[in-house]
């Protein structure tokens, strides 16, 4: 196996596993080969290995790996971030040491800025703690966003933090805190991404993509004069087998002349650049849609339930008026019945009691519920209509792309 084959194979394996690890669990890939590979690598193969270990070694290896896996995947730790920074630092050092003297001053001028930017934004993402919800800032976080009464409802209490959950927040078991406007926990920065550091994460993705593209371009500028890159003389294009044979020969020649430090790093940069840029494009889509990663997953569950015909919509003001009327009609002696007691408790859950008054440009009177039997809530059938698609639901957090961007980069 030649050096080119080894480089390409290593890059392909790293890129493929990274892509599957990052995107395999997304709802969009649930019924695709990527989702299947994610379940294969993360669920089925580990279960098969556990059975083999249990029969041969009594499960001792699985137990030891389980403790290690619990630390790596269920405890906040810097392992993934250190691997990421090690690859970034090692690749940059190898390339600059071998190619520094072959680059012009104009090419070298942007290097300090392009190279240091990912380190800066990684630091800002990893060290920011202001999005953690604590008793000291809890009241302020309650007034960040209004409750939409779909994904977020008032008076819900975190069982771990023992604080009422602000709208758009989520508890992170790895960080041990509820996180304001939680997007997701990112092992690459060993921290949750939320209200006050999400924009740094976007900058990290952009800076990393720019670094890889620029690094690949520098590697190509060094290798280009060393190889015979003349495809026009044979009058072919990439749809001919001859073109691919020529490309293979050129790549092999480049690998031998540039070595791992230049050709290898350049290929690694060129082939992995789509990963951060693709993830950045996905997050730009989320911003355009007025969602976080956490909310996108929640909406996907609602979408599936709507397709099953088990979701109903009503005007919240009508439901509250109906509940108030029911409470007024039920006398004290009737409350002693178990069924009516449950009904009154349910009515109280739907009240607006304790909901903070939030200054937000969009408001909605909608309320949606899901039922197990596919029928509207008992006794209130006339208030609810069945809905089949998310287009029938208003997302109050979507203010339009420009205002959504402003909310990300200039949070209130």
Which residues does each PLM region occupy?
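Membrane-associated feature with strongest affinity for ZDHHC
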Residues: 1-171, 182-185, 189-412
């Amino acid at each position: 196996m030649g050096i080119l084959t080894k480089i390409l194979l290593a890059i392909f394996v790293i890129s493929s596993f990274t892509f599957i690890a990052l995107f395999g669990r997304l709802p969009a890939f649930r019924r695709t080969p990527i989702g299947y590979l994610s379940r294969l690598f993360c669920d089925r193969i580990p279960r098969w290995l556990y059975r083999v270990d249990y029969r041969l070694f009594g499960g001792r290896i699985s137990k030891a790996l389980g403790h290690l896996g619990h630390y790596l995947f269920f405890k906040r730790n810097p392992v993934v971030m250190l691997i990421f920074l090690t690859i970034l630092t090692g690749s940059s050092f190898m390339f600059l040491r071998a190619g520094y003297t072959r680059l012009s001053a104009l090419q070298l001028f942007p290097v300090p800025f392009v190279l240091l930017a990912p380190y800066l934004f990684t630091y800002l993402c990893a060290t920011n703690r202001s999005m953690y919800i604590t008793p000291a800032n809890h009241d302020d976080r309650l007034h960040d966003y209004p409750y939409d009464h779909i994904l977020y409802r008032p008076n819900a209490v975190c069982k771990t933090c023992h604080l009422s959950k602000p709208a758009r927040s989520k508890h992170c078991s790895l960080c041990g805190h509820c996180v304001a406007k939680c997007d997701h926990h990112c092992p690459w920065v060993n921290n949750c991404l939320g209200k006050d550091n999400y924009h740094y994460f976007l900058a990290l993705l952009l800076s990393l993509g720019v670094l890889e593209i620029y690094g690949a371009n520098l590697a190509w500028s060094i290798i280009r004069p060393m190889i015979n890159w003349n495809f026009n003389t044979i009058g072919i294009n990439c749809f001919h087998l001859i073109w691919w044979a020529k490309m293979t020969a050129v790549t092999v020649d480049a690998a031998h002349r540039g070595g791992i430090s230049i050709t290898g790093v350049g290929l690694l940069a060129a082939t992995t650049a789509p990963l951060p840029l693709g993830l950045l494009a996905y997050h730009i889509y989320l911003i355009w849609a007025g969602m976080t990663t956490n909310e996108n997953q929640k909406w996907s569950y609602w979408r599936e339930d709507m397709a099953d015909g088990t979701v109903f919509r009503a005007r919240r003001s009508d439901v509250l008026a109906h509940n108030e009327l029911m409470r007024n009609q039920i006398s004290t002696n009737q409350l002693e019945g178990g069924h009516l007691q449950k009904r009154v408790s349910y009515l109280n859950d739907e009240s607006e009691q304790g909901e903070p008054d939030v200054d937000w440009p969009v408001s909605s009177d909608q309320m949606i519920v899901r039922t197990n039997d596919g029928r509207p809530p008992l006794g209130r059938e006339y208030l609810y209509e069945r809905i089949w698609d998310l287009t029938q639901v208003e997302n109050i957090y979507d203010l339009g792309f420009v205002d959504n961007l402003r909310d990300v980069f200039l949070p209130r």
